[in-house]
A protein has these predicted regions:
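Rossmann-fold NAD(P) dinucleotide-binding segment
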Residues: 54-63, 71-92
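Glycine-rich adenosine-cofactor-binding loop
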Residues: 5-18
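Short loop/helix-cap segments at secondary-structure boundaries that form the rim of catalytic
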Residues: 39-45, 59, 80
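Short, ordered loop/turn segments at secondary-structure junctions
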Residues: 38, 92-95, 120-121
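NAD(P)-binding Rossmann-fold cofactor-contacting core
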Residues: 17, 24-44
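Rossmann-fold NAD(P)-binding glycine/threonine-rich loop
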Residues: 91-115
Length: 132
């Protein structure tokens, strides 16, 4: 069975946490980290690329985990990434989730991909917990 090839977009606290988690999964392989910052070193030694280099990884990464902030990053990054990659984000600006969904859904459909948005604690797992 082949491993799921993962890319991480953003390398702050959430990105480093995603990196640590992916490293523990026997069925996943971390391929690349993408950042706006230059001269970053990852904890695992995985190479860091610029955001402009992301499209070079089309077909080489199965899923992008977006680790930017909801206020300014994800609202722009998720639709852009969803055009080329299956992606997951943790968008948590409650009043804008419907707008975010609409934008990301349109981009993913145009690109023939899929996107899972607002997958975090709240909204996300905490919201599901309240249903049951």
């Amino acid at each position: 069975m082949s491993k799921i090839r993962i890319g991480i977009v953003g390398y702050g606290n959430l990105g480093r946490g995603a990196e640590a988690s992916v490293q523990l999964q026997p069925d996943m392989e971390l391929v690349a980290v993408f950042s706006r910052r230059n001269d970053l070193q990852t904890v695992s030694g995985i190479p860091v690329y610029t955001m402009n280099q992301m499209k070079d990884f089309k077909g080489k990464i199965d899923v992008m985990i977006l680790c930017g902030g909801s206020a300014t990053d994800l609202i722009v990054q998720t639709p852009a990434v969803a055009r080329d990659f299956v992606c997951i984000d943790s968008f948590d600006t409650h009043p804008r989730i419907t707008e975010h969904f609409t934008t990301v859904d349109k981009a993913a459909k145009e690109g023939g991909t899929a996107a899972l948005i607002s997958c975090g604690w709240d909204p996300g797992m905490f919201s599901l917990q309240r249903v049951f």
